[in-house]
Structure formats: structure tokens, C-alpha cells
């Protein structure tokens, strides 16, 4: 399975870069994952940039009004996509202004990481960690407690 994270904005701080690299390395045995960064501008222009980078398959938009899932539920959702033969999943992370309505309309699932608001850099790390956790749950490997 191929996964693509399409994120608005660039991670500039070294500690966020290190955390992202850490989880990207840990995810490599489970999935091909690439990250595309879209320039931060007004949400409509960001939306066009995001939509231009979709790689087919299922699209998940991270949105504060999206569906909440536990780690176990995310693992089950991901496992179902694998069983269905889904070739790719796009994960979209908006910038400070959120996602355009066009992007939300195009998404197959709107997912909320929490009721709390996080900086978009942290949202990327949280998503990577939850994807790693989901694969460990699916493979029944130790990590999730």
C-alpha cells in the first residue's frame, strides 16, 4: 500500500523534523509513505495545491469537525482498506486556516485527531505516530498498550 501525506506548510523546527523522520523510518517496513508539502497561502489556493497532489485511492482529511476514532478503530479502518485492496491513501493536513470546502468535499473521510487544536506541525507527528501504532496493532506486534 502507498500512503501520501499532503500537508500545508513546511516543518522548520529541528525537533519536529527529527520526530517526523523517526516515525517515517519506523513506518517503512509497513508501507510506502511520501510527504508532499504545499505552500501556505489562502485556503482556496492551498486547496488547489492539495487536490493537484492526490494520488488516487482513498482520501482522508484531518479536520476538527471530523469523525473521532480510537487507535484501535483507526487500525481496523486501515486494515479494512488493506483487505479491500485499496492501493493508496492520501492523508491531508491543513494549515492554520483549515481546509477549503473543495478539499473537504473531495475527501472520503474527515478525521479528527482530537477535540483540541494542535499546531499543524504537531498534527503531522500525531498522524505519523497513529499510523505506526495502527500497523503495530494490525500485525499484533508489541507497541500498543
From Swiss-Prot:
Sites where the protein binds S-adenosyl-L-methionine: 62, 94, 113-118
Reactions performed catalytically: pseudouridine(1915) in 23S rRNA + S-adenosyl-L-methionine = N(3)-methylpseudouridine(1915) in 23S rRNA + S-adenosyl-L-homocysteine + H(+)
HAMAP family according to UniProt: 23SrRNA_methyltr_H
Biological role: Specifically methylates the pseudouridine at position 1915 (m3Psi1915) in 23S rRNA.
UniProt EC number: 2.1.1.177
Coiled-coil regions listed: none
Family label: Belongs to the RNA methyltransferase RlmH family.
GO cellular component, one term: cytoplasm
Protein name: Putative ribosomal RNA large subunit methyltransferase H
PANTHER family according to UniProt: METHYLTRANSFERASE, RIBOSOMAL RNA LARGE SUBUNIT METHYLTRANSFERASE H
Keywords assigned by UniProt, alphabetized: Cytoplasm, Methyltransferase, rRNA processing, S-adenosyl-L-methionine, Transferase
Gene: rlmH
UniProt entry tagged with the keyword Cytoplasm: yes
Localization per record: Cytoplasm
Gene3D superfamilies, per the entry: 3.40.1280.10
Main location: cytoplasm
Domain of life, source organism: Archaea
